[in-house]
Amino acid sequence: MIETISKTIKYHFKNPQLLHEALTHPSIISKDSLKFNYERLEFLGDAVLNIVISEMLFNIFPKDTEGNLAKKKTALVCGNQLVKVAQSINLGQFIIMSDGERTCGGANNHNNLENALEALIGAIYLDGGLTAAQNFIHSFWKHTAIHMDIPPQDAKTILQEFIQGKRLPAPTYHIIDKSGPDHNPIFTVELRIPLYKTIQATGNNKKLAEQKAASLMLNQIKDQIK
C-alpha cells in the first residue's frame, strides 16, 4: 500500500509511520485500540494547505486585490476541491477504517476524503518539510489556480448580493433536521427569504447544505438576476 500511494503522490516517506497515521480513520481506534488516527495531522495539514495556497496565489496573481485573492483561496481549499484531489489519487481506497465504516461507504465519504487529504499534507510536511508539502500541493492545485481568471463566487454570496439589491432582509439558513450516524451525518437546511418560497436542501455538513439551498434558490429566481 505504501509503495502504491507513494508512486501516486510522487513522494516517498522517510518515516512510513506518518503515512500510516495520516490514513487511519478514527473508527479504527475502538476496534484495534490504536492510539492514533488522522485527526491531529488533519489539523496541521489544513494550516499548511492554507499558507501554501495563499503564497501560491500571491505569486501567480500579482495584480489581484486582497478580495479576489481571498475568493480564489476559498475556492481552492473548499471541500469540493479537496474531494476532487482526493479522488484523483484514489485516496479512499487507502484509508484504514473499520469494516462497519467501509460497509457504510466510508471510502467514498466526502468528509473522510477531505480529512484524510489534509492529514496527508500534514504528514508530508512533518516528514519532508515545507518544500515537500509545497511540491505536493502545487502538483495538484496549481493548474486549477492558474486558470481561475474570474474570481469565483459561491451561491450564497451571489444570492446575498441579489437580495441586498432588492433591499430585502438577508437570507437566513436554519437547520431543521440532522439524521444519519455521527460519522456520516445528513443535515437538512431551510433557506428563508421574505416574499420568496422557502427552499430545503441536504448535505453532509451545514455549509454544503446551505450552498445547495442557495443554488436551488438561484435556479428558482434566475430570470430575475441580470
UniProtKB/Swiss-Prot annotation:
The keyword Magnesium applies. One of its GO terms (cellular component) is cytoplasm. SUPFAM superfamilies: dsRNA-binding domain-like, RNase III domain-like. It catalyses: Endonucleolytic cleavage to 5'-phosphomonoester. Keywords: Cytoplasm, Endonuclease, Hydrolase, Magnesium, Metal-binding, mRNA processing, Nuclease, RNA-binding, rRNA processing, rRNA-binding, tRNA processing. Residues 154-223 form the DRBM domain. Disulfide bonds: none annotated. Its cofactor is Mg(2+). Its main location: cytoplasm. Mg(2+) binds at residues 42, 115, 118. The active site is at 46, 118. It holds the Pfam family dsrm. It is found in: Cytoplasm. SMART domains: DSRM, RIBOc. Homodimer. This is Ribonuclease 3. It comes from Ehrlichia canis (strain Jake). The lineage of its organism: Bacteria, Pseudomonadati, Pseudomonadota, Alphaproteobacteria, Rickettsiales.
